């Protein structure tokens, strides 16, 4: 299957490279197209663009965990627009599925609304694709990671930096889940969150609902006459047991099926509101 691989952290993210390698290892064709800059927190936005009538696209060589390289597209656009451009044939034959990530930071709880990673996947659903957003629970408490979003324990090459996130753990779970998603009905959307730990330390994979809050939150650290200073910190607010945020903190990988934007059935006082219209709603 031809699968779009994208993210919101940008084309040079090692999480993106690990995800692309996992898709190829699972026997699929990876079309790697990701933003040329960081679009974390972009949700499903389509801009702004420097030029509304032109998007920059550059072919780049991307490193993958086995030491080889693959070709990708560095795109001057947010991830949701990249999904749209892929469907329009901007990167060759349109794909049949999209996987986005591996995000540097969790995407849990109702805060998933703001995720560019998930925005790319939900946009793909509009074109009839199934998709999966993948995020690694990289610590953000020191303010060094965006959080919007291989070591010997998981069979990959030795990690040169002990602080390097365990991208291989998330990649292994992608290879496990992907065959099911390929066989699932069209427009099936999954949100996968993985602990930042060796695969052997992950307690298991659990289906989970969305927590009221996500794993990280924005705080204002300063106010002056010219603006606000912001930071992103780990969310220490209590969350209900069994939700994605709670299970992830407890060492479980979590997977949550998501619905795209849809209408709900609510009884509205239409007759009362229509009375103010010239025709009275007739």
Each model region followed by its residue ranges:
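Electrostatically charged, flexible surface regions
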Residues: 144-282
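Short, ordered loop/turn segments at secondary-structure junctions
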Residues: 35-38, 103, 136-139
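A cross-family phosphate/adenosyl-ligand binding-site feature
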Residues: 3-6, 13, 17-87, 93-94
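Short glycine-rich anion-binding loops that position phosphate/pyrophosphate groups of nucleotides
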Residues: 9, 38, 78-79, 103-106, ...
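Short, acidic/small-residue loops that bind anionic groups at enzyme active sites
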Residues: 114-139
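Glycine/threonine-rich flexible loop motifs
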Residues: 106-115
């Amino acid at each position: 299957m031809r699968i779009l691989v994208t993210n919101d952290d940008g084309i040079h993210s090692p999480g993106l490279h690990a995800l692309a390698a996992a898709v190829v290892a699972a026997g699929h064709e990876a079309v790697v197209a990701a933003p040329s800059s960081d679009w974390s927190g972009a949700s499903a936005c389509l801009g702004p663009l420097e030029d509304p009538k032109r998007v920059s696209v550059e072919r780049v060589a991307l490193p993958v965990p086995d030491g080889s390289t693959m070709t990708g597209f560095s795109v001057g656009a947010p991830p949701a627009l990249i999904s749209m451009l892929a469907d329009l044939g901007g990167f060759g034959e349109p794909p049949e599925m999209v996987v986005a990530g591996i995000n540097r930071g969790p995407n849990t709880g109702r805060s998933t609304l703001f995720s560019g990673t998930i925005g790319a996947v939900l946009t793909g659903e509009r074109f009839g694709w199934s998709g999966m957003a993948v995020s690694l629970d990289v610590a953000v408490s020191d303010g060094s990671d965006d959080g919007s979003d291989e070591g010997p324990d998981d069979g990959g090459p030795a990690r040169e930096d002990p602080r390097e996130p365990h991208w291989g753990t998330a990649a292994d779970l992608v290879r496990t889940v992907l065959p099911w998603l390929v066989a699932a009905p069209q427009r099936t959307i999954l949100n996968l969150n993985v602990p930042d730990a060796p695969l052997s330390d992950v307690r298991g994979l659990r289906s989970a609902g969305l927590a009221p809050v996500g794993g990280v939150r924005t705080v204002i650290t300063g106010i002056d006459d010219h603006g606000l200073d912001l930071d992103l910190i780990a969310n220490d607010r209590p969350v209900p047991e069994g939700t994605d945020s709670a299970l992830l903190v407890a060492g479980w990988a979590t997977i949550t099926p998501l619905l795209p934007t849809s209408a709900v059935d609510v009884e509205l006082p239409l007759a009362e509101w229509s009375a103010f219209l010239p025709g009275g709603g007739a």
